[in-house]
Amino acid sequence: MIKMFKYKQVIVARADLKLSKGKLAAQVAHGAVTAAFEAYKKKREWFEAWFREGQKKVVVKVESEEELFKLKAEAEKLGLPNALIRDAGLTEIPPGTVTVLAVGPAPEEIVDKVTGNLKLL
């Protein structure tokens, strides 16, 4: 049986930074947790439905910081919970470098308006 999800979270990573796999995984996790907490505070019903369904997450990529900021503006305009992550700069990249944007959890059809055309990482 195929499970159908109504809610999801999409994490958008900057491919241009060429982060190590471990660093990228940590940044994606920071985004996922931070955006989920935003949803928990501001869109509790979306968070709870997403959590019950199994917490669907999709990781996609962009090639620039500018693209992340444009996507964040679109997410904000649609009222989607989101989180823009800036690295502390302790290891691979300078402090304050924007690494990922997490959008949702929220209804799939709304999230797709922001991230639906992006390629999987």
From Swiss-Prot:
EC number: 3.1.1.29
Pfam family, one: PTH2
SUPFAM superfamilies to which the protein is assigned, alphabetical: Peptidyl-tRNA hydrolase II
Keywords, sorted A to Z: Cytoplasm, Hydrolase
Chief localisation class: cytoplasm
BP terms from Gene Ontology: translation
One Gene Ontology molecular-function label: peptidyl-tRNA hydrolase activity
Highest rank taxon of the organism: Archaea
Location(s) in or outside the cell: Cytoplasm
Record keyword Cytoplasm present: yes
InterPro entries recorded: Pep_tRNA_hydro_II_dom_sf, Pept_tRNA_hydro_arch, PTH2
GO cellular component assignments: cytosol
Catalytic activity, reaction form: an N-acyl-L-alpha-aminoacyl-tRNA + H2O = an N-acyl-L-amino acid + a tRNA + H(+)
Uppermost EC category: hydrolase
Family designation: Belongs to the PTH2 family.
NCBIfam families given in the database record: arch_pth2, PRK04322.1
Record HAMAP family: Pept_tRNA_hydro_arch
Function noted in UniProt: The natural substrate for this enzyme may be peptidyl-tRNAs which drop off the ribosome during protein synthesis.
Name of the protein in question: Peptidyl-tRNA hydrolase
Species: Pyrococcus horikoshii (strain ATCC 700860 / DSM 12428 / JCM 9974 / NBRC 100139 / OT-3)
